[in-house]
Amino acid sequence: MSNFTAEDKAAITSLWGKVNVEDAGGETLGRLLVVYPWTQRFFDSFGSLSSPSAIMGNPKVKAHGVKVLTSLGEAIKNLDDLKGTFGSLSELHCDKLHVDPENFRLLGNVLVTVLAILHGKEFTPEVQASWQKMVAGVASALASRYH
């Protein structure tokens, strides 16, 4: 059963249709790595993450950010089954990568910040509430393997 109302779904999908995944993805992952530097430990293979400018200009950060937001796009298509949508990713992040599930919540909050920056007045409090609900649902689905 979904916790998303018809209004939530409309707010999420309407804004998502305007999101440039390449721009928002790189910005989101880059900001996560700058604001929460301990998350960098999962990205040793990305090369230099020595400064905010190195992180924000790193092509591997941008590419992985695109991958993350592309995955989020799949979630948006399956809001009624986030746990099922992220089952294999939850397993990967838990069993192989050993990512602290709190990082999923942090990433979601950074994404909401980026969307607010990129979409300005269109990112109303109501739209934000729907997106917060969605990123919390995604974080919970990604953390499901940990429980």
UniProtKB/Swiss-Prot annotation:
Keywords: Heme, Iron, Metal-binding, Oxygen transport, Transport. GO terms for cellular component: blood microparticle; haptoglobin-hemoglobin complex; hemoglobin complex. Heme b binds at residues 64, 93. CDD domains: Hb-beta-like. The keyword Lipid biosynthesis does not apply. One of its GO terms (biological process) is hydrogen peroxide catabolic process. Residues 3-147 form the Globin domain. InterPro entries: Globin, Globin-like_sf, Globin/Proto, Hemoglobin_b, Hemoglobin_oxygen_transport. Gene3D superfamilies: Globins. Gamma chains make up the fetal hemoglobin F, in combination with alpha chains. Heterotetramer of two alpha chains and two gamma chains in fetal hemoglobin (Hb F). Belongs to the globin family. This is Hemoglobin subunit gamma. It comes from Alouatta belzebul (Red-handed howler monkey). The gene is HBG.
